[in-house]
From Swiss-Prot:
Lineage of origin: Eukaryota, Viridiplantae, Streptophyta, Embryophyta, Tracheophyta
Oligomeric and partner information: Homodimer.
Protein's organism: Oryza sativa subsp. japonica (Rice)
Record-annotated site: Transition state stabilizer: D117
Protein name: Uroporphyrinogen decarboxylase 1, chloroplastic
Top-level EC class as recorded in UniProt: lyase
Amino acid sequence: MISATATAAFLAAAPASSSSCTTHRRRSGLPAISASLATASSTEEPLLVRAARGEDGLPRPPAWMMRQAGRYMAEYQALAKRHPSFRERSETTELIVEITLQPWRAFAPDGVILFSDILTPLPAIGVPFDISDSKGPVIQSPVRSEEQVRELTPIDFEKLRFVGESLKILRTEIDGQAALLGFVGAPWTIATYVVEGGMTNTYTNIKSMCHTAPNVLRGLLSHLADAISEYIIYQVNSGAQCIQIFDSWGGQLPPHVWEQWSKPYIKQIVNKIKIECPNVPLVLYINGNGGLLERMTDTGVDVIGLDWTVDMADGRRRLGNKISVQGNVDPAFLFSPLPVLTDEIHRVVKSAGPKGHILNLGHGVLVKTPEEAVAHFFDVTRSLRYDTLFQGCVTEVLEPVA
């Protein structure tokens, strides 16, 4: 494990930095990534970043897994016994780095995603939370009034230094051999926790606010969109090369309601990032997005993640091939015989086509997933070659379904 002393020494020795986003970001006081990390030609960039941008001529699809660092790994379980608090594990630089690197060392995925949580930035905007073993996240004072929205603060990065420090260390540790991913929650998804006070199966409070207190909800979502935008820029300036936006509970909304209450705030974020950090690909993942695919295309993101309930070939037809896709092997296939998993990987890759595809699961890795299956997933992906899989095929230009 990387010690606190080693962490401090690394950060003290970090070179002078220059922003990887547009230069006028300097006025915001956000930390900036070092020039050595910011300048790389397309051919030097990680495979995942190039696939996210939809570049031609890649040899194979890159692969990573949502929740690839975590509870299914024996190494993580041993660490969690020594550090039983999830908040400690996800808010301590040396632990974040160690946990993030565990699957990288074991399986060498093409993407290494920061070990964190979508709720991590909440205390930095004035919303404290706890995590209960039985209930999950708990927010003692749910935000449901105009006065409470006014009390929210601009995001304070002094309270998130562990995120920036971890990303800087990870970018150096990975050393260009994979893409470093950061992530955020979408405003609607974060708001579900803030309004409901934690996890919920019904979303009745926040859904009713759409009608009973729409101005309060708009104020909350707008504040979250601003904070999340700044948080993305902070992650990019600390070393993240690609950002995934999780609208985990957007799929709990009827499509027309998602269009009104989630999509505009995602677009607000994307528009700002495309101005401030135009070279950083953005991935949008919504669990249960089969009814939303066509509505997701004009959010401005570079990649749309598909969950496993959407057939990849159908998803590609509906989205067209001018936008990249991510996914979407059912996590349960990792419990199947390895030849079955191999066949499913081949099916998904062939369905996605030879361009603009990041192989992933359709959801996070399940708790008891065999590590052997995870290793096999990445071994198979590394063995793939587009020129063999699509030999003699002519790529059809697909326009998104209107």
